[in-house]
């Protein structure tokens, strides 16, 4: 399966039990910041934004004072899982980023999608990739 198929079929799909509800944008990005696959709506990000995200995975709490920035949008960092998941909130939407061995699985949402639904979609694919040694 291509990386684009993972984004299209597993991240940008309808959320179980909520037909028509889906993430606003999604991507799979290498630890080096290279985009493996993304939705057409995923924001173009700066290398320093991805560097900050990677630093927070290695040094949890790094982004808390400044916020998580992606594509010029600032998200307030909320409780995640140190070294594994970063979650951010902005208004009625937010972001979930799951770290795997080689990649970051990113999902961005807006209402009516809930934070928990975004977490479920992103973390399910991230856990699967971890199981596959990715």
Swiss-Prot record:
Post-translational modification: Phosphorylated by MAP kinases.
PROSITE patterns: PROFILIN
Gene3D superfamilies given in the database record: Dynein light chain 2a, cytoplasmic
Sites bearing Phosphothreonine, chain numbering: 114
Superkingdom of source: Eukaryota
Keywords, alphabetical: Actin-binding, Allergen, Cytoplasm, Cytoskeleton, Disulfide bond, Phosphoprotein
Disulfide bonds: 13-118
Gene Ontology MF annotations: actin monomer binding
InterPro entries, per the entry: PFN (IPR048278), PFN_euk (IPR005455), PFN_sf (IPR036140), Profilin_CS (IPR027310)
Subcellular location: Cytoplasm, Cytoskeleton
Cellular component GO terms, alphabetical: cell cortex; cytoskeleton
Physiological role: Binds to actin and affects the structure of the cytoskeleton. At high concentrations, profilin prevents the polymerization of actin, whereas it enhances it at low concentrations.
Subunit structure: Occurs in many kinds of cells as a complex with monomeric actin in a 1:1 ratio.
Family statement drawn from the similarity comment of this UniProt entry: Belongs to the profilin family.
Protein name stated in the entry: Profilin-2
Organism: Olea europaea
């Amino acid at each position: 399966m291509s990386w684009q198929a993972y984004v299209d079929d597993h991240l940008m799909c309808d959320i179980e039990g909520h037909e028509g509800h889906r993430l606003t944008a999604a991507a799979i990005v290498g630890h080096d910041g290279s985009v493996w696959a993304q939705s057409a709506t995923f924001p173009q990000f700066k290398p320093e934004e991805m560097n900050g995200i990677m630093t927070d995975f290695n040094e949890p709490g790094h982004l808390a004072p400044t916020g998580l920035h992606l594509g010029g949008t600032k998200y307030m960092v909320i409780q995640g899982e140190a070294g594994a998941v970063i979650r951010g909130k902005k208004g009625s939407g937010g972001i979930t980023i799951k770290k795997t061995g080689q990649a970051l699985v990113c999902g961005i949402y807006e209402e009516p999608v809930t934070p928990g639904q975004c977490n479920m979609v992103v973390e399910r694919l991230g856990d699967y990739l971890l199981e596959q040694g990715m």
